[in-house]
């Protein structure tokens, strides 16, 4: 139940002409200190209409406001503060969670709508680095959140399996590669060749030309070029699949850039039909001068297509195939101009569905204050970080709970969860300084802290068996009330995370719930035999439901024992 809405409805009966219910709801605040109640309405906006001081208006409103749902109404300066009936609210909230279980928090505003989410999208023949973690986990979380809000979600891994870099890689392999060596450790060896190409090209400009020539051969279907490309792609997808399994990430499809090669000429034909193509120094472009942007390059002077051509083609294909209402591109901020050009070209074609398309950028993972770069080899491999995190979790379990069943599985959940939560706990546009030490801490604002809180709550429930269906829940103490208020916010938290494309809204929320529950655990004798025992256990159960579901929305597992 939305209790602020109830407050707004009560106030709207007083302000029948002055403010709409929505205007009232937008003005209602949550006091930072408990002594000022559970909700507050500021009267500043009414001073001009009433020709009275806000404090006087607040007193008059407080006298008129009568509702059994409020145990106390008071005017404090220019604010009308209300205290909700704790027994009524706690009973309603707990019964809702107990009935809905993991469905609690489900929203319906995405019902009968489709969202396409383009995320992860690593490049073939390059290691899966920590730098890929952000797009992968932000996109994965947004997928879960959108599904929770009723959307039909299509999760696409737009693999970087095409482009001039493959001409460079083929050139490097032909010059310095050894088939037997590459077969021993394909991704690492191919990456070494990629880095070597960029080191050598500074002294040998002809290498760049050779790279372009090999990519042209690849586009034209040259047998040797295609065979090498297929090999690079096959080996890369094997590595990616292993890492996605560790992270618990799944996709609807893996349609990479190469998938659209045979569709691009049709799209270029559409641009020609709309008279949007211009020739510029032998290349084909869409002029975006009126929009204040550089021209969007569609085809190079040598006839090769580029990233923008494939993205435009892919967008039309996805709209025709999935009929999306929204399309999110979870890609770094360095691509902002590309997406502005890309969306603008679609608008110039008259496609109204482009209004539902959005670039979802994020900050970088930094190493020593610098962005990681695959070209220069400044790279930390994600798989190595995950393996180390899992090993550390295993050591921790051996020390604290050596008799734990399924230790390896729990260590995987905790280790991977630590890495994922570290990535998602801050607002997505913030840069993250890579620190294995901070990422793997098992206290403070970390994934393992939330997981441990969930496991602690589960351990309490294993000690008692209660039939909640016949109970009426009457919790009034401050510690219980703080948790109930937090649990009641979960549906709105999910809605906010979806609207803002911001998983950190949920990360911060589950940390708040965990911290509030741990205070409760430290101050309340939960299993004492008295009239409120069943209510306390219902509260503990509700906490496990919300923590587990909140972590799931982030892509983090919630073990019941740790």
Swiss-Prot record:
Keywords: Aminoacyl-tRNA synthetase, ATP-binding, Cytoplasm, Ligase, Nucleotide-binding, Protein biosynthesis. A motif ('HIGH' region) lies at residues 122-132. Its EC number is 6.1.1.19. GO terms for biological process: arginyl-tRNA aminoacylation. It catalyses: tRNA(Arg) + L-arginine + ATP = L-arginyl-tRNA(Arg) + AMP + diphosphate. Its main location: cytoplasm. The keyword Repressor does not apply. InterPro entries: Arg-tRNA-ligase (IPR001278), Arg-tRNA-synth_N (IPR005148), Arg-tRNA-synth_N_sf (IPR036695), ArgRS_core (IPR035684), DALR_anticod-bd (IPR008909), Rossmann-like_a/b/a_fold (IPR014729), tRNAsynth_Ia_anticodon-bd (IPR009080). Pfam families: Arg_tRNA_synt_N, DALR_1, tRNA-synt_1d. GO terms for cellular component: cytoplasm. HAMAP family: Arg_tRNA_synth. Monomer. Belongs to the class-I aminoacyl-tRNA synthetase family. This is Arginine--tRNA ligase 1. The gene is argS1.
